[in-house]
């Protein structure tokens, strides 16, 4: 095959790969599985409690976010009040700490009143979306921990954005 033709074939394949990746990351399917390397795997349908499979290995040192389902509604701003469903696990042992899904009622609060990891990780998310947050201790509960969360614990949250005001 001539060199120019081969280059064109690779260019077309690259464009198709990017288009496919863009479609699937922009909410092409409400049942989402998989994650970026090193992050927890999150599965489940929109409107239902997620299933989280924590990864093994060292926790990331910086805040990590990943849209599992991309919402199409109102965007979260730093000044927003949110209504969300969430699930919280600890990185160190994969223990479920808390889930609003268990009580059946979502939580409502001003974004300015929660941990730094949420304040920095949720703006830009939209109603109808599901976002994974992996929050290092310095943006969570720090060296003291809080209740069942131990000192210097990395937190895994999956947050479904229900309403923004």
What are these regions (language model features)?
Residues 1-165:
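Cross-family detector of peptidyl-prolyl cis-trans isomerase
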